Amino acid sequence: TPTATTFKKIEWNTDVDTFHKSSRDNGTTFARVEDGQWDPKNPNVFYFVTTESNKDPIATAPNPATPDVTRDGGALWRLTFKDAQNPLLGANLEMLLNGGESIMMSKPDNITVTNNGVVVIQEDPGGNAHVARVIAYRISDGKLATLAKFDSQYFTATGSKYMTIDEESSGVIDVTSLLAKPGDTNTYLMLNAQIHVKGGVTKADPAVTGALTARRPDLRNMPSSSKKRIDIEAIE
């Protein structure tokens, strides 16, 4: 059911504490808003995913096929603005997927919306025994399907060519206009695969130690040991 939603202007060019207070006082809290995309056929419609659900029992119910693997199906949302060029006029917010659908989505991460009306969703299970997939949600009727899946021989601990259980795809875009030939009705997507395998780095380069975390004010309260790990493991 669409829910009427209002927007307020938040001053972003300020210090972190002021920004956080303003956001808390005027905003709505979601569990990890991760990525969003405008509908190319409707400039007033915006789709986005939340990677987690704040431990919602529906979204975190185990996949019957892999009952021992933890899961969070997050959610897919749609914002329909009265006028996207003037968001202060308001919008309607809808939850399209609640994470409990039979496809048993796990950690929806990045998305795109194709010209033929499909939301493409990439999973990032995050160091989890679930093998990551690329999922399609057809806007017209809500049908779900798996478009692609990582090869289990590389990404399950018992696989014959095991590398890691920390794999994801990211950055999906619709490149049909670049690749399709006249008369071709296929949809073409481009994405990358992120295989999180350490490259043998055991310590951070002194020249860049702290350079990453120092530029992330949201990490300033992180323990020093965690900051060191980020500096080391940023190279994969």
Predicted regions span which residues?
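Sequence/structural signature of beta-propeller domains
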Residues: 1-236
